[in-house]
Amino acid sequence: MKEYRTINKIAGPLVFIEKTEPIGYEELVNIVLYDGTIKRGQVLDTSDDLVVVQVFETTTGIGKDSGVRFTGETIKMPVGRDMLGRILSGSGKPIDGGPEIVPEKRLDITGAAINPYARASPSDFIETGISTIDGTNTLVRGQKLPIFSGAGLPHNNVALQIARQAKVPGSTEEFAVVFAAMGITQEEANYFMQDFERTGALERAVVFLNLADDPAVERIITPRLALTTAEYLAFELGMHVLVILTDMTNYCEALRQIGAAREEVPGRRGYPGYMYTDLASLYERAGIIKGQKGSVTQIPILTMPGDDITHPIADLTGYITEGQIVISRELHRKGIYPPINVLPSLSRLMNLGIGKGHTREDHKKVSDQMYAAYAEGNDLRGLVAIVGKDALSERDRTFLEFADLFENRFVRQGFDEDRTIADTLDLGWELLSSLPVEQLTRIDRDLIAKYHPQFKNAGAAQKR
């Protein structure tokens, strides 16, 4: 292994090295300090006479006389079934006090986006136990469905609840969760670890924790380690894997930080111009492959700076993914948990995973009717603020009351409350029964006769 002593410049986490031989992109590098200590890095960029290396830890102690060895290998993740139940650092090292992972394979962390021709269409419903997701913005196996949140909102709690409760109802196949947190505080890391251990969810999970004081470079690697692990569990072991990535905003900030250190020409709001491509290289690793048993489903979580849904991170994520779940500051102020606003939320693949043979025949109609009724009631709140409640017609008051009922009964649920899809749909019918039957214009008459509490109870009484 040839050793160079031609370090030209050090800038933040980057080391610039003069070279005379071809060096591979993303090649692993060992930097040897004067005392023999070795720091690892990766080739970020290469030109005719210069190589840019990003160091996985601080560059403290690296000098122009330090030795640089190019290994000729890329980063590989040691993977195996024994990873389930383990908590790892953002660089894939065990931090739970357990033994080192004995790898069954070592896989390149860059992976590969699934060939579009090899993709199978998502069609299986994933039950999260949260009514606003299951009932109105359904998650489908193989989908990538982000959560858009804001600073100070309980997206971490929502992420933990999904990680704990997610399952494919009626399936006998194994289900696993890969949870990767990026740029979190030590307090948040402790909270995540304690909740996984308290609830027993850790048994079927692999957890990666990258802390805020860890190098920015590690934040770029963490989601790739998580997705490589998920792909192994899904496509080698045949498991259904849900990958939760939080917080993608911290990931993008790390991209911006490294881009600034490389003196790149910035794009929108200082983020690199290639951020769209970079995010796509992560999100497109979700899906189902024809002929394979397993699947990878993604829920990336991001905090929108200033609650701005047009911010580049949210904007680009929305282009690549298949919908969004929006966490509302207004609902959070009302003390409602989980504060998911169904009106701007959307699951583009919802119709593929609901209905007869998937959830229940009335699912789509109930969802559409609740959405329409809540939207109308929510609009009436603005009118009430101007003209007062007394100026409303009897019909309008009914819809206004439905909006309050929807938020307090359907949206609101406990942190440990796990509702089945049947519970969610039955609750939806219960709320819709507060509206006159003639106002249920989006539901077929035969479904009303079968599921509406008024007719359902009357039918049961007649049978007796």
UniProtKB/Swiss-Prot annotation:
GO terms for biological process: proton motive force-driven plasma membrane ATP synthesis. Its main location: membrane. GO terms for molecular function: ATP binding; proton-transporting ATP synthase activity, rotational mechanism. Belongs to the ATPase alpha/beta chains family. Has multiple subunits with at least A(3), B(3), C, D, E, F, H, I and proteolipid K(x). Gene3D superfamilies: 3.40.50.12240. InterPro entries: ATP-synt_VA_C (IPR055190), ATPase_a/bsu_AS (IPR020003), ATPase_A1-cplx_bsu (IPR005724), ATPase_F1/V1/A1_a/bsu_N (IPR004100), ATPase_F1/V1/A1_a/bsu_nucl-bd (IPR000194), P-loop_NTPase (IPR027417), V-ATPase_su_B/beta (IPR022879). Component of the A-type ATP synthase that produces ATP from ADP in the presence of a proton gradient across the membrane. The B chain is a regulatory subunit. One of its GO terms (cellular component) is proton-transporting two-sector ATPase complex, catalytic domain. It holds the Pfam family ATP-synt_ab_N. This is A-type ATP synthase subunit B.
